[in-house]
Amino acid sequence: MAINAQEISALIKKQIENFQPNFDVTETGVVTYIGDGIARACGLDNAMSGELLEFDNGTFGMAQNLESSDIGIIILGDFNSIREGDTVKRTGKIMEVPVGQSLIGRVVNPLGQPVDGLGEIETTATRPVEAAAPGVMQRQSVSEPLQTGIKAIDALVPIGRGQRELVIGDRQTGKTSIAIDAIINQKGQDMICIYVAIGQKESTVRSQVEVLRKYGALDYTIVVTASASQPSPLLYIAPYAGVAMAEEFMYNGKHALIVYDDLSKQAVAYRELSLLLRRPPGREAYPGDVFYLHSRLLERSAKLSDELGGGSITALPFIETQAGDISAYIATNVISITDGQIFLQENLFNSGIRPAIDAGSSVSRVGGSAQIKAMKKVAGTLRLDLASYRELEAFTQFGSDLDSATQAKLNRGRRTVEVLKQGLHKPLAVEKQVLILYALTHGFLDSVPVDDILTFQDDMFDYIDSHDADIFETIRTTKDLPEEAVLDKAIQTFKDQSQFS
C-alpha cells in the first residue's frame, strides 16, 4: 500500500485547523487564614472589589479588602470546611440574587435560596445586590399615599409611595407589629411587600411568616431572613439582597414596600466584619464608611419618573435604640438619610397606648403631599391638639382649678389618644379612619365615655356599612369628604340610636 505524503500532510493540516483547545484559564489563589466568616488569600492580584470568589468546596466569598500582599474575603455560607492552603479562584462576576414573580410567597436566605421547604424557585432572572441608585432626573416627587391602616401613622405621619420612613424605638415597643400591620393592609393595593429579617430568632421569623399567611398577606410578600445564627456576612448583605428583589418590580412599573427589620443589627454585623478585616475603627468601633453602608441602601428606594414606568420602592427601615436615645450614632445617621421617622416610646407602650407613637418626635417630611384630601381635612389640627393636650396634662398635675375651656381641651385630648389606639393586626381602611377622626374633631365623641370610645367606633362602622355605605364609597373613590351635612346626620342618627346617646 503506497503512502501518499501529500494526503497525510493535508490531513494533518486539516486536523490542526480544526483543533479546538479545550482548557480554561482561571486565576487562583491560596487561603492563608480562615475564621469567623473571614478568609485571607494571596495570589489573586487582579481580583476586583466586590467580586465573587469560589472556594474548593463550592462556597462563594466576596472580595472586600484589596491589599498589596493579600485580599480579605467575606464568606457567603459555611466556612467550617474551608482550610488554610485551599485554593480559591476568581469568577469574574459580582454577586447577584434571583428576582421575579416566582419569589412571591416564599421565604429565602440572602443568597435567594429557599429555606421554607417548598422546593426550588423557578426563575432565571437575577439582579446584582449592589446597584446604583436612580439619579436625580430619574425620580419624581412623592405624590401617591401608602396606607398603613394604622390611624396614628396615616393621620399624623403619612407615608407616600417612594418614601423612606424610619421606625425607631427601644426593643419590645411594637416596631415589627407596625410593619406586619402595614404589610397586611396592602392587600388589594397592587403592592409587592418584602420583609427582610436581620439577626432575628428563627422562631420569631417563623411566627411572623405564619401571621402573614393567616391574613393572606404571603400571597404578595417575599420574606428574606438572615437569622441570628447565620454568619455575619449574610446579615450584612441581607438588606441589599432584599432591595435588589424590590428593584425588579420597581423597574417594571410596579410598587414595592420593603421593611428592614432591623438595620442596627446589620450595622453591628458590618462592624464585626470590618474589625476582623482589620479596618481602622471609628466612633463606637464602627468603620468610617458606616454612613455609606446605609445611605447607598436607602437611596435605592425611589418613586421613578413616568418615562421609566412610574414604579416605586417605599422603605421602612428599623433602628433599635437603647433607653430611648435617638441621638446615638447609627440612629442619627439613618434619621439624616430618611424622609422622616416614627418614634415609639417605651413608657407609652407600657401605659397601654398602642401603637406607642410619640407624636411630638415623629415626623414625615414628604408624606403630607401624598395624603388624601379627606384625611388632610380631618387630621389637620390633630398633631397640634395632641401637643397642647400633653402640655395641659403636665400642668394639671399641680392640682390647680381649671376653667371650662381648658377642661374641654383635656377631655378632647383624652379622646384623641383613645381614638388613635389600635389592636394588633387590625389595620383600618382609610375611609373608616377618616370617619372616626371626623367624629372626633367635630365633637361627636365629647359625650362618649373614654373607655367606650373603641366600642363606639366599631359599632359606628357597622351602622354606616349597613345604612349609609355610600359615605365610605364616596371617600374611597373621590378621596374627599362627602357633604358635612350628610356626615353629621349619619353620625348623629347612629349616636341617637346607640347606647351612647
From Swiss-Prot:
Organism of this sequence: Streptococcus mutans serotype c (strain ATCC 700610 / UA159)
EC number of the protein: 7.1.2.2
Protein name listed in UniProt: ATP synthase subunit alpha
Subunit structure and binding partners: F-type ATPases have 2 components, CF(1) - the catalytic core - and CF(0) - the membrane proton channel. CF(1) has five subunits: alpha(3), beta(3), gamma(1), delta(1), epsilon(1). CF(0) has three main subunits: a(1), b(2) and c(9-12). The alpha and beta chains form an alternating ring which encloses part of the gamma chain. CF(1) is attached to CF(0) by a central stalk formed by the gamma and epsilon chains, while a peripheral stalk is formed by the delta and b chains.
Disulfide bonds: none
Membrane topology: Peripheral membrane protein
Family of this protein: Belongs to the ATPase alpha/beta chains family.
Record keywords: ATP synthesis, ATP-binding, Cell membrane, CF(1), Hydrogen ion transport, Ion transport, Membrane, Nucleotide-binding, Translocase, Transport
The gene coding this protein: atpA
Primary location recorded for the protein, binned into one broad class: membrane
Localization (cell): Cell membrane
Any one annotated GO CC term: plasma membrane
One of the record's GO molecular function terms: proton-transporting ATP synthase activity, rotational mechanism
Binding, ATP: G169, D170, R171, Q172, T173, G174, K175, T176
